[in-house]
Design a protein with these regions (language model features):
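Short, charged/small-residue-rich alpha-helical element at the C-terminal edge
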Residues: 215, 221-289
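Conserved ABC transporter NBD signature motif
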Residues: 56-66, 70
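Conserved catalytic motifs of ABC-family nucleotide-binding domains
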Residues: 147
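Catalytic Walker B motif of ABC-type/P-loop ATPase nucleotide-binding domains
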Residues: 151-155
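Conserved ABC ATPase "signature" region
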Residues: 94, 98, 105-122
């Protein structure tokens, strides 16, 4: 579906993406992960044809990215989605459906279905009066008005509460089940793990790890999850806000906590990726010089060097610019 070869993008000589190669198959959910400034948005915008590569090729099916015909098969959700504040959700979506020449009845059915699924209420409310989560849902519905084969979502759950985030992530999975290819970027490894088939981790414009999330974790370190249950579960500690915290090391254990909590008449209120673990994975990968990465050397050294440098364990200490900060 997508073939990226030797992709390089510079802004006035500044290398935002430096030689990316990856492929995404049809129906796959593909995550682009990395710290602020890693080059995720640049990569996604290049796939969407909104940015021209400085070097390299980006092919989407039979088209080059940027080909006008390709756009008809694409749904792009930018990180910040400015909406026309005076329009209602319905009129806004109808406006975009008209731009894509979608017949009225078909457009209404499609957008109402999407908004039902995302549980968006008040569809005739002004967009300017909607909450951030509601606006994000409208933006997601907009990305689907043309029934695209490929969806490119930049931080789809950015700034959303846990419940809305879950809707959005579950919905992303549903889209792939309906045969759509989804490429999305995120900071949160838990979000990525819950929906992505494969992932690339970027840092300073470079892909520094790739594979399924379990493959990456196995190779580069362990992530832990803090699961907040509404009832006591085995090994949990009560938190100040009346929840019960259990820290576990993998998704099977997260699922076991959820089942235990539900069996006890409660549920899971929130799940958080343990940040130091995430940073350990990142430091393990990104702290090594590129040459050492090639042959697997330098892994323990780089984390140790970061700590010896005076930083907290897992904290980056070398952010001389805006690149490479989680
Ligand atoms: N139009 C631009 N002009 C100059 N530099 C840019 C431009 N767009 C991005 N950059 C720089 O390129 C680098 C990569 O930016 P990009 O937005 O792709 O990163 P990102 O991984 O999406 O970051 P974030 O997580 O903060 O959104 C950053 O250092 C950024 O400052």
């Amino acid at each position: 579906m997508i073939r990226v070869a030797g992709l390089r993008k510079t802004y006035g000589g500044f290398p935002a993406v430096v030689g990316s190669d990856f492929e995404v198959s049809e129906g796959e959910i593909f995550g682009v992960v990395g710290p602020n400034g890693a080059g995720k948005t640049t990569t996604l915008k290049t796939l969407a044809g909104l940015i021209e590569p400085t070097e390299g090729t980006v092919e989407i099916g039979a088209y080059d990215a940027g080909d006008a015909e390709m756009r008809r098969h694409l749904g792009f959700l930018p990180e910040e989605s400015p909406l026309y504040e005076d329009m209602t959700a319905r009129s806004y979506l109808r406006f975009f459906a008209d731009l894509y020449d979608v017949p009225r009845e078909e457009a209404t059915r499609r957008t109402e279905d999407t908004l039902d699924r995302l549980e968006l209420e008040h569809r005739d409310r002004r967009l300017g009066d909607m909450s951030k989560g509601m606006k994000r849902k409208v933006a997601i519905a907009r990305s689907l008005v043309n029934d695209p084969d490929l969806l490119i979502y930049d931080e789809p759950a950015s700034g959303l509460d846990p419940l809305t985030t879950n809707y959005v992530l579950e919905f992303t999975r549903e889209l792939a089940e309906r045969g759509k290819t989804v490429v999305f970027s995120a900071h949160n490894l838990y979000h990525v793990e819950s929906v992505c088939d494969r992932v690339v981790i970027m840092n300073r414009g470079e892909i520094v790890a790739r594979g399924t999330v379990p493959e990456i974790r196995e190779e580069h370190g362990e992530t832990t999850y803090r699961v907040f249950a509404t009832v006591p579960v085995e090994g949990s500690e009560a938190t100040d806000d009346g929840r019960y915290l259990r820290t576990v090391g993998d998704m099977a254990a997260v699922e076991a906590v959820r089942v235990e909590a539900e069996f006890a008449g409660g549920g899971v209120a929130d799940i958080r990726t343990d940040e130091p673990s995430l940073e350990d994975v990142f430091l393990d990968i990104a702290g090594r010089p590129p040459a050492a990465r090639e042959d697997g050397r330098g892994r323990a050294d780089s984390a140790a060097a970061a700590r010896a440098d005076g930083g907290r364990e897992g904290e980056r200490t070398d952010s001389g610019d805006d690149r490479g900060t989680w």
